[in-house]
């Protein structure tokens, strides 16, 4: 597997960064895209890296926030063949804050109906290609995390804490174990790993890639996450985006060589 980071908070050289995330993944002779970042930057960086978005065979949206979906329009303009897999719970209804402080942080308006022929929204765990799966959340009570993070979804005229039912993991099965991608891990990396473990009957997990959404947590809470990662037995965590520099430093001090930080243009071979 070859992974190229197209969009992340950290730029590198002539590759610009942004608050967003996008991965280009080559696996078993096919090309996948996970998320489109917060703008068209993923495509600009891809061109610099010699990656043609038109060649992507399959695209996946991790969740319905703007920093992972705002480049979808650019993707559909550049690519005429790939299906785009989203959660059936991904709607234009995600907000940060309440009242006068509320701001829309969701999908580009109209993006799903205007591309309905290519949007796929399977329910439950789905094998979208050979040895490639999307795994939705199956854990109750995640709305308490949404409340703490000041993240909400609009249902009618009501705003309720986000339970992240629109979030899903992208999982690849390899000969040496599972590779899990979860772009923001809003529910917690420990919850994601537990859900994937149940879905795949505790198959070995080779690596975990994505943001960990730790920038709002205290130092002690971040250390607790490090302990849970150690207890999981995963020996390769590659993170960035919403993890935050402070949290990454704490994780690095605990996990050492088991964790690395990605950036735009980084190529990861697994």
What spans do the regions from the language model cover?
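Short, structured coil segments at secondary-structure junctions
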Residues: 49, 80, 115, 233, ...
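Conserved beta-strand hairpin/beta-sheet module of binuclear metal-dependent hydrolase folds
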Residues: 1-49, 163, 167-181
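Glycine-rich phosphate-binding "P-loop"
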Residues: 1-13, 150-161, 210-214
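Cap/insert and terminal regions of metallo-dependent hydrolase folds
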Residues: 68-70, 161-169, 173-264
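Short hydrophobic-aromatic micro-motifs
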Residues: 32-34, 128-137, 179-182
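Active-site metal-binding motif and surrounding structural segment of the metallo-beta-lactamase
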Residues: 41-92, 200-207, 230
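Metallo-beta-lactamase
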Residues: 90-168, 231, 260-269
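Divalent metal-coordination and catalytic microenvironments
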Residues: 25, 35, 46, 63, ...
